[in-house]
Amino acid sequence: MAGCRLWVSLLLAAALACLATALWPWPQYIQTYHRRYTLYPNNFQFRYHVSSAAQAGCVVLDEAFRRYRNLLFGSGSWPRPSFSNKQQTLGKNILVVSVVTAECNEFPNLESVENYTLTINDDQCLLASETVWGALRGLETFSQLVWKSAEGTFFINKTKIKDFPRFPHRGVLLDTSRHYLPLSSILDTLDVMAYNKFNVFHWHLVDDSSFPYESFTFPELTRKGSFNPVTHIYTAQDVKEVIEYARLRGIRVLAEFDTPGHTLSWGPGAPGLLTPCYSGSHLSGTFGPVNPSLNSTYDFMSTLFLEISSVFPDFYLHLGGDEVDFTCWKSNPNIQAFMKKKGFTDFKQLESFYIQTLLDIVSDYDKGYVVWQEVFDNKVKVRPDTIIQVWREEMPVEYMLEMQDITRAGFRALLSAPWYLNRVKYGPDWKDMYKVEPLAFHGTPEQKALVIGGEACMWGEYVDSTNLVPRLWPRAGAVAERLWSSNLTTNIDFAFKRLSHFRCELVRRGIQAQPISVGYCEQEFEQT
């Protein structure tokens, strides 16, 4: 019987898709009809409900109203349409927006409510939500429901939607160290994230290759660690702009400063921070991970992370902790002496000592933290509210077994392993990402409730501003729908039709999103 209900629901979804072909991600509940209403661009407006907690002056929604009016109709004037069918003349010139709780000057967080309802019928055109963040998601859905006839008339169908995200953390990671991404590329990415209902920008700011974050506490890190200290850095103003731009789109900024590995770019600007490597009994002239044996290391980290904690308002920081190469530590006699003094018998214990000390430092600043899975694998003692991000896809531990182990230990988990978008293969590889079920591991309902979402990751070894957009979009949309929509929304044919239309909508909005199959868009990219 359950299988029969699922089959019927998929048939219904396919039928509805004919009326809502560009809806992405698919809502939790939707009813839509052939009855349609005309939208008049010259007169259309967004308006606050008289009882809404948010009113004019709420910058989050005021700015969103301007954005979506421009996305829908542009800035030009439109002639009044003429009709042969009287049914088409019933117009909808106002979308009324009602919010229960005004959070207009706040930042979104992991607990933010994004539910909304959208009702379009003869009597009303109403978007209702508990928060401004839910209203933002509803505005995006509304914009996708509007369509234009061959004659140039805008319509919207009679529709009822009740929608909410399946997971609260739906992220995109950008790596701005291996290749510097201009500020405009980051802001453009935030725009398209909002179109896909992503709500976390995981900013992998620094790595071995470069240190583009401009630190006001340790300016030499940027001067000596960036590719170019004038053109290839993110100033304090740049960072503030990213954070505010994201906030206005309901997106959190999760900043990552990965240590003790992935820190070679830190060395030139912070003498004594990295471990000197030895070749036999002599210094080799090279450096390895952060030196965990010196008190000065922890003084430095304490000062730097105090700054970072003040710059980035989100409760969580990402502290990395992955891929620590022990070779240099093994070669260094001072490290060996420190380990002997501490009673450490292997280098995982040394790594754990460093990470545990860093976690304690960050905790003192009233921050939570996200770490890569190695921190859990190496049995570092962490707070119960730590979030573990799973990224390793290969054996010996398959990523679903890792999810099982992490949640069994009582920790919250994020999944990224199957969603590395920098890895490209010929053909519609978005389907592989779409088919991933984040809860497809053996575990109790309590374990599965600890999976709070996941992230699509775009690492930068072979990605810069020349190929970021087409490599990211619309492929990341597969992850967006998996993290937003119901676990029953899995039909590939249904997804293909909608994603094809959504890709064309992205192109219409000026996004150079790559095609997912043979075909065309009514408005091609060079025409935008």
From Swiss-Prot:
Keyword entries, A-Z: Disulfide bond, Glycoprotein, Glycosidase, Hydrolase, Lipid metabolism, Lysosome, Signal, Zymogen
Q: What does the record give as the reaction this protein catalyses?
A: Hydrolysis of terminal non-reducing N-acetyl-D-hexosamine residues in N-acetyl-beta-D-hexosaminides; N-acetyl-beta-D-galactosaminyl-(1->4)-beta-D-3-sulfogalactosyl-(1->4)-beta-D-glucosyl-(1<->1')-ceramide + H2O = a beta-D-3-sulfogalactosyl-(1->4)-beta-D-glucosyl-(1<->1')-ceramide + N-acetyl-beta-D-galactosamine; a ganglioside GM2 (d18:1(4E)) + H2O = a ganglioside GM3 (d18:1(4E)) + N-acetyl-beta-D-galactosamine; a ganglioside GM2 + H2O = a ganglioside GM3 + N-acetyl-beta-D-galactosamine
List, from the UniProt record, the residues annotated as the active site of this protein: 323
User: Can you say what this protein is called?
Assistant: Beta-hexosaminidase subunit alpha
Query: Of which family is this protein a member?
Result: Belongs to the glycosyl hydrolase 20 family.
Question: Which residues are removed as the propeptide when the protein matures?
Answer: 23-88
Q: Which domain of life is it from?
A: Eukaryota
List of glycosylated residues? 115, 157, 295, 487
What InterPro entries does UniProt report for this protein, alphabetically?
Answer: Beta_hexosaminidase_sua/sub, Glyco_hydro_20_cat, Glycoside_hydrolase_SF, Hex-like_dom2, HEX_eukaryotic_N
Question: What gene name is listed for this protein?
Answer: Hexa
Question: By what means is the activity of this protein regulated?
Answer: Addition of GM2A stimulates the hydrolysis of sulfated glycosphingolipid SM2 and the ganglioside GM2.
The protein's matches in Pfam families, at most eight in alphabetical order, are given as: Glyco_hydro_20 (PF00728), Glycohydro_20b2 (PF14845)
* Top EC class, one word: hydrolase
User: Quaternary structure per UniProt?
Assistant: There are 3 beta-hexosaminidase isozymes: isozyme A (hexosaminidase A) is a heterodimer composed of one subunit alpha and one subunit beta (chain A and B); isozyme B (hexosaminidase B) is a homodimer of two beta subunits (two chains A and B); isozyme S (hexosaminidase S) is a homodimer of two alpha subunits. The composition of the dimer (isozyme A versus isozyme S) has a significant effect on the substrate specificity of the alpha subunit active site.
Cellular localization per UniProt: Lysosome
